[in-house]
């Protein structure tokens, strides 16, 4: 039985410690343990380890016994530190209970007040929502009524305009009141003044809307001016004014025809100067237009900027939870943001502008390269033309060499003819005058025949394709023969050393003297052709009067046989020389190649990259500051969620000369003190 009592006592002790009955060993196992030598250790363990309730009760009894000694005695507060710690904790617990009751009462009162305020806010929200809905309904009705009123006003205005137009288009009847022509003249003069003011407004270059309004106002004034005047009187006055204007124009034309002081024509410098002035005026007009546009954009920017800053400030306040007291910090933050944002936009636009400038310069370089290639091609073509000219010059020189050889042959035949003539003159000196005259005719004919024979002996393949008839040449040569009255002989023009006939005391017949007399008169005197035609058809004196034979004259080109053709050829040569000079001057390129320094561009790009990196660093700093503000806002939000009042109490608001943080720290202190003392027994209620 003794072992059974020990077993039951052990089971009670284990269950008091909190051990479940299923985890206890069986009775046989416990009996074997008690029978063995380890029963003493088990008894010591049971005596040393007691349940928590038993230990707490013992401690409370000891505390009650200690408190009983101080019963009905005065215990000063200063001597609390000399009291036992259990008593100190007990007194603190009592004080904390009182504070807890007060806090609970305050919490209940605050909850009731909060519930009342929330109910009032809900009712007010319902009332405001209903009022807003009613306001929107009334505004919609007002808008509908405004639209209807506007449409009615438009219809009314249109009807008034139609009425005025009908009255204005109705022709005026002629009556005794409006039959005076002076009244019509005054109306026309007034209308002309109104037109002058309107055209002056058009010349000033006002806006299109102002011009439209001025045009409408002009038509209204015209209708009011001609309202009481018939069309017939207006037509008579207008025709009289037109007649006066025509008379004035005719007088001006007569005076202009009489005056001869015309202005001298402008030279190239004055024309270029006027063009430059016109370009300067155009640039000035563009500058003033750009300045006006800049002023308009500045006004628009100021308007939009103020609205943008207000919206941004409200968003920053709402996002960061900034109160009105921290307005300076918010303004500083907004100004920093605006400066950074504007700098970033400015740098982006500057980079885009530089990129466009680089592309434009690259295109200009490509265009310059293409232009250089085109000029190279033109130079090649010009060189080819010059090569053709050189080859033609060489060919002409070869032809001239051949012509010099032909000239030698002609001189040889001429000398041979001179010898033949001398022999014939020596044989005919002994004849009489009549036979001399006959012999003279024969000699002249023989001379022409010999010239023709010598001409035929030459190689015809080397002569020019332009040939003059031999009879014409002979007549031209005969027309240049002149009379020598000293020795009574006939001498060819330009060949004084050659004598066709020796007079030697012989007398010429009268008809031959008359022939020699008329021979000196030019051919133009005997023809019916005018001087201009003779200039075009007569022979060139530079060729005819030269001491050359007919065969030599035939070698000259056809355009040199007349003075007109020679002048035309000279003009052609002058034009050709001026064209070549102009072409050579055009070949001189005035291109100034565009120089792009890649080193400067790299330096500029590096500087811009550094500025961009600095801006990115500033943006990162702003992002970090924003993240800190977000974390602060998140902490405030978590605090609001954990706060039982569900609202933020600012530090400036105090209660009994203490802030909310002081009360919170004191409450946390008491709460830790109560929760850390796990072995303390809570006092009964």
Swiss-Prot record:
Keywords: Cell cycle, Cell division, Centromere, Chromosome, Coiled coil, Cytoplasm, Cytoskeleton, Kinetochore, Microtubule, Mitosis. It is found in: Cytoplasm, Cytoskeleton, Spindle; Chromosome, Centromere, Kinetochore; Cytoplasm, Cytoskeleton, Microtubule organizing center, Centrosome; Chromosome, Centromere. Its main location: cytoplasm. GO terms for cellular component: centrosome; cytoplasm; HAUS complex; kinetochore; microtubule; spindle. GO terms for biological process: cell division; mitotic spindle assembly; mitotic spindle organization; mitotic spindle-templated microtubule nucleation; regulation of mitotic nuclear division. Residues 87-165, 342-379 form a coiled coil. GO terms for molecular function: protein-macromolecule adaptor activity. The keyword Cell cycle applies. The name 'dim gamma-tubulin 5' derives from the decreased gamma-tubulin staining of the spindle pole seen following RNAi-mediated knockdown of dgt5 in S2 cells. Component of the augmin complex composed of dgt2, dgt3, dgt4, dgt5, dgt6, msd1, msd5 and wac. The complex interacts directly or indirectly with microtubules and is required for centrosome-independent generation of spindle microtubules. As part of the augmin complex, plays a role in centrosome-independent generation of spindle microtubules. The complex is required for mitotic spindle assembly through its involvement in localizing gamma-tubulin to spindle microtubules. This is Augmin complex subunit dgt5. It comes from Drosophila melanogaster. The lineage of its organism: Eukaryota, Metazoa, Ecdysozoa, Arthropoda, Hexapoda.
């Amino acid at each position: 039985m003794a072992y059974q009592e020990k077993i039951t006592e052990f089971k009670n002790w284990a269950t008091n410690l909190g051990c479940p009955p299923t985890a206890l060993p069986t009775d046989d196992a416990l009996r074997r343990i008690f029978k063995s030598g380890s029963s003493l250790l088990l008894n010591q363990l049971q005596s040393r380890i007691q349940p928590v309730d038993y230990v707490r009760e013992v401690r409370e009894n000891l505390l009650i016994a200690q408190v009983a000694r101080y019963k009905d005695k005065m215990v000063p507060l200063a001597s609390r530190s000399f009291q036992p710690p259990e008593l100190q904790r007990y007194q603190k617990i009592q004080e904390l209970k009182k504070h807890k009751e007060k806090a609970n009462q305050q919490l209940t009162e605050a909850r009731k007040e909060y519930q009342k305020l929330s109910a009032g806010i809900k009712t007010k929200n319902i009332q405001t929502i209903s009022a807003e809905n009613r306001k929107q309904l009334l505004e919609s009705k007002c808008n509908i009524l405004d639209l209807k009123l506007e449409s009615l006003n438009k219809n009314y205005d249109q009807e008034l305009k139609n009425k005025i137009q009908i009255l204005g288009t109705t022709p005026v009847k002629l009556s005794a009141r409006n039959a005076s022509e002076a009244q019509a003249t005054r109306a026309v003069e007034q209308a002309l003044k109104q037109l002058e003011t309107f055209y002056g407004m058009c010349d000033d270059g006002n806006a299109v809307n102002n011009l439209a309004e001025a045009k409408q106002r002009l038509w209204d004034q015209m209708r009011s001016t001609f309202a009481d005047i018939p069309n017939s009187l207006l037509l008579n006055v207008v025709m009289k004014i037109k007649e006066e204007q025509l008379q004035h124009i005719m007088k001006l034309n007569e005076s202009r025809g009489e005056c001869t002081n015309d202005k001298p024509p402008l030279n190239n410098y004055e024309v270029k100067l006027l063009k430059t002035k016109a370009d300067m005026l155009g640039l000035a007009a563009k500058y003033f237009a750009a300045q006006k546009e800049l002023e308009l954009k500045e006004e628009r920017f100021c308007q939009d900027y103020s609205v943008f800053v207000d919206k941004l400030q409200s968003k920053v306040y709402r996002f960061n939870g900034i109160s009105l007291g921290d307005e300076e910090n918010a303004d500083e933050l907004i100004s920093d943001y605006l400066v950074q944002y504007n700098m970033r936009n400015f740098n982006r636009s500057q980079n885009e502008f530089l990129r466009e400038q680089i592309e434009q310069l690259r295109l200009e370089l490509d265009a310059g390269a293409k232009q250089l290639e085109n000029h190279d091609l033109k130079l090649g073509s010009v060189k080819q033309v010059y090569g053709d000219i050189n080859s033609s010059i060489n060919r002409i020189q070869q032809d001239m060499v051949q012509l010099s050889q032909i000239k030698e042959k002609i001189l040889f035949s001429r000398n041979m003819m001179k010898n033949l003539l001398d022999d014939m003159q020596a044989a005919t000196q002994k004849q009489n005058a009549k036979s001399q005259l006959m012999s003279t005719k024969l000699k002249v004919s023989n001379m022409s025949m010999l010239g023709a024979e010598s001409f035929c002996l030459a190689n015809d393949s080397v002569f020019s394709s332009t040939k003059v008839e031999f009879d014409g040449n002979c007549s031209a040569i005969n027309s240049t023969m002149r009379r020598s009255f000293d020795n009574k002989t006939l001498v060819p023009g330009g060949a004084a050393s050659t004598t066709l006939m020796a007079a030697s005391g012989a007398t010429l017949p009268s008809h031959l003297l008359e022939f020699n007399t008329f021979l000196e008169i030019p051919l133009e005197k005997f023809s019916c052709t005018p001087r201009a035609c003779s200039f075009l058809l007569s022979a060139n004196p530079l060729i005819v009067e030269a001491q050359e034979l007919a065969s030599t004259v035939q070698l000259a080109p056809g355009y040199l046989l007349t003075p007109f053709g020679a002048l035309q050829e000279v003009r052609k040569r002058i034009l050709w020389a001026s064209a070549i000079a102009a072409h050579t001057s055009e070949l001189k390129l005035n291109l100034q190649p565009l120089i792009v320094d890649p080193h400067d561009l790299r330096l500029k790009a590096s500087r811009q990259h550094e500025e961009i990196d600095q801006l990115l660093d500033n943006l990162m700093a702003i992002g970090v500051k924003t993240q800190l503000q977000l974390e602060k806002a998140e902490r405030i939000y978590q605090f609001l969620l954990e706060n039982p009042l569900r609202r933020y109490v600012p530090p400036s608001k105090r209660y009994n000369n203490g802030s909310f943080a002081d009360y919170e720290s004191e409450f946390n202190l008491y709460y830790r003190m109560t929760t850390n003392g796990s072995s303390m027994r809570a006092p009964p209620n």
